[in-house]
Amino acid sequence: MSILDYRRQFIEGLGFGLDRFQLDAIEAVDKRVNVLVSAPTGAGKTLVANYAIGRELEREQRTFYTTPLKALSNQKYHELCELYGSSRVGLLTGDTSINRTASVVVMTTEVLRNMLLTESDQLTTLGLVVLDEVHFLQDPFRGGVWEEVLILTPAAVRFVALSATIGNATFLGQWLNEVRGPTTVIVELTRPIQLHNHIAVMKRGEPYAEIHDLLDGPRLSNEARRIDNLMKSSRRFRPGAKWQGSKSSAPPPPFRAPRRSELMQALEREDLLPVIVFIFSRAACDDAVHQLRRDGLLFTKPEERREIEAIAEARLLDFSHDDLQALEYADFVDALRRGIAMHHAGMVPAFREIVETCFERNLLAVVFATETLALGVNMPARSVALERFTKYSDAGRQFLTSAEYAQMTGRAGRRGLDDEGHAIVCFASDLALHDVGRVALAPPADLHSSFRPTYNFTANLINHFDYETALDVVQRSFAQFENDRRPAGHRRPLTDQMIARHHVLEELGYAEGWRLSPEGQLLRSIYHECDLLIAESISAGVFEDLEPAALAGLLSCFVYESKRSSRATNAAKQVSTKKKRVHHDRLGQERRVSITERLREINVISATVREVEERYRVPHFKEPDGHFATIIAAWARGATLGTVLDLADAEIGQTSPGDFVRNAKQVADLCEQLGRMRHLTDVADVALEARDAVLRSVVAGASTVHPRE
């Protein structure tokens, strides 16, 4: 089929007209150049990717579709199965492998990076890579993976990169042009559904919350200015101000923040449901759901409640009664039946998936969510509300950035269902509305690199390239591209970081000049932020002669990171002696001592590595943290979820089921990596047993891809 015939057939099959930016992007795809599309959430970027995938299928070339999150990969897998048929689509997410040799394979970006570093034979007929959510390139922990993929993918492979709106798309395109060849940059700034910004406020003495326009075109609305002025006048007469009058005579402020039930009732009156309410605390999300239940709010009809129950029961068939009890399932499903839910990383993945399915089917009126939802699965709503316009960071409480505001409000407005989307900011007495307006009207933020050479990456460069070529690979990074354009006094070549890591590897015996030792070859296959420490621990025999559960516990020290060690320690001290003794007996004191001794060995190794790193000014990896060890060991020995969560409360402070599952999954991933090292026969076999012991019940449920009904 000719290009024009295919294009015509594709567009006619959509049943709706395309926007100008989509037509321009499709034309660029047909010219067989790389394409970068920067457009608002919901604008239809995915359509460009679907067109490019179809063209590759016509040419009998494979496509890899990468996403930053397993949840997004699962969602995209289902979408592409519906488009092209399940026989032509596969899924690879590290813990899930479906039809891996398919013509179109969806995967997390790390999976593709690992394929490139191991020179997988899966790459032989690869024609196209779709990099979805390429703005993750700036993620401080994982963003470097996107650059590694763009640099290392064979030159013949083309890219379609999809990004949320960024301010420096042209600059990013210039870099892509250098590392990937001819690249067309498509920028769309207009939202497909117009966004209206509002303020939710309670007037003193009024019974109902009010929703007012925040903006009038490119400026603050008259009502917003009036609220600001009245609050400014009020503050002059409030305690703590410079006014010298009597505190008792100060009038109450004219406005206050609406309570959660008041906000929901106002949104329902204004026909602004369903809504996602962003709250920057998991506990506050849970509290919000509890408050609405306590206040008796109900947004569903009987037939909707029955459908919600059916969705939840079908997803949780494999969960035991004890697990459901530990997860407080009864409270969760009662809220769902009312059309109310929460969505955050503290929930087990199965519960989050139930919320997503119910919301997708328009069965929920409100979801209280942390901002991770804005970065995750596609879940648009008619409205988005922000309970506060500030959040805590390392620098204290700060305003949301324009990028954060745009990311969250990008969920407002459902294409095909809503003519307009609505963003509602809840009033706060310490919030000036002109600050909200300034952020809402700010241009898109620029994208910046977070790439830094790791030990694993350096080892793979040594293995694959000569010294000069390896330097060139690092110099081709977006980080170096940005660095080269800074003022002369502020530049530091990234090659210096790679060279420093090479010196560390030489001193520790992983490299002899520009050649890897057997230990260096081992390091190449470890994909983790503690890659060198794990390799050193393997070489020292720390993982030998352990039972599977103890090995899982030991590996957790590379995964787990105490949020506040002091708080966890205090929490453990407050647990009764009786409760502690019960946990120790269940685990077995002898087993516990075995893990503790090995943890000491790892800490000694860590200190040695740090001394070498300090000499070469290499940033340290995270400290090993053994607080999760006895918890995951108990789980691997068959303890129930309730027992393990009780143990976690005693050992490290209150732990959510979602946090437990996430850490357990990461331990299982490390077990899988050790299990693939067949030259370590005994350790590899035990590691695979440990993986299987960890991947059960709710943890295994997080790995499952469930078909859509």
Q: What does each model-identified segment do?
A:
Residues 586-709:
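C-terminal amphipathic alpha-helical interaction region
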Residues 151, 158-160, 165-291, 341:
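Conserved interdomain linker/interface between the two RecA-like ATPase lobes of SF2 helicase motors
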Residues 157-158, 379, 383-439:
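Conserved segment of the helicase C-terminal RecA-like domain
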Residues 8-11, 16-201, 274-279, 286-300, ...:
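Conserved P-loop/Walker A NTP-binding site and adjacent catalytic elements of P-loop NTPases
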Residues 532-605:
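Leucine-rich, amphipathic alpha-helical/linker segments
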Residues 1-35, 216, 220, 300-337:
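Helicase-associated low-complexity/disordered flanking segments
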Residues 350-359, 449-554:
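C-terminal accessory/connector segments of nucleic-acid motor ATPases
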Residues 64-66, 74, 81-90, 278, ...:
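Conserved C-terminal RecA-like helicase domain
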